[in-house]
Design a protein with these regions (language model features):
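Catalytic-site signature of metal-activated, phosphate-bearing donor transferases
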Residues: 1-171, 180-184
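C-terminal-biased regions
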Residues: 176-177, 186
Length: 186
């Protein structure tokens, strides 16, 4: 039977629903039967794992209407950037010795993880710039006006550059010494 319901995600930023860039056609599970789902154990970007049953897709949208001030956004993403830098360093240097067990989380989740793995192998700083160009120019984010620019710039370039700056800072202080990197991250 049906254990979970998925919806199409729509993003709003600065009070405007964004229609371009990379915000469309993402399916997310937000409703599920008690005991039939659990969140993955990850530092960030956790996904819901459906333990048993089918997932039905609703025709309605879930609107992620971000109402944070720019100060709140900056604080939140600074914290996220530290965690993402740690995850990327772990992937590069195998710091924790843990290995992510591949499970079927759905095509969307697996596709996004494959994209993140490709992104992680690109050169620092250039990848953030390229990601912004992809979102804002190629995927037509500029058609969403000032709100689209702010979303793509802050979330797509500024945040990604901050992650790379944190990685750069750690590598500058520690080199490629796994032990030093682990100490730095504590």
């Amino acid at each position: 039977g049906v254990s979970a319901l998925s919806l199409s995600l729509a993003r709003a930023y600065c009070g405007k629903i964004l229609h371009h860039g990379i915000v469309n056609n993402v399916k997310i599970v937000r409703v599920f039967r008690k005991g039939m789902a659990r969140y993955e154990q990850r530092l960030m970007d956790e996904h819901l794992e459906i333990l048993d049953g089918e997932t039905a897709e609703l025709k309605h949208q879930f609107v992620d209407d971000n109402r944070m001030t720019f100060g709140q956004f900056t604080d939140k993403h600074n914290n996220y950037a530290s965690r993402e830098a740690a995850l990327l360093l772990d992937a590069e240097f195998h710091l924790t010795g843990s290995q992510i067990v591949s499970q079927d989380h759905g095509k969307e989740v697996e596709r996004k993880r494959a994209q993140k793995n490709r992104y992680a192998k690109m050169p620092l700083f250039w990848r953030a710039f390229g990601y912004f160009v992809y979102r804002y120019i190629i995927k037509l984010g500029f058609l969403d006006g000032k709100e689209g620019f702010l979303w793509d710039f802050l979330q797509g370039w500024w945040y990604r550059t901050l992650v790379d700056a944190k990685i750069f800072e750690i590598k500058r202080a520690c080199g490629n010494d796994k032990k030093k990197i682990c100490q730095y991250l504590k």
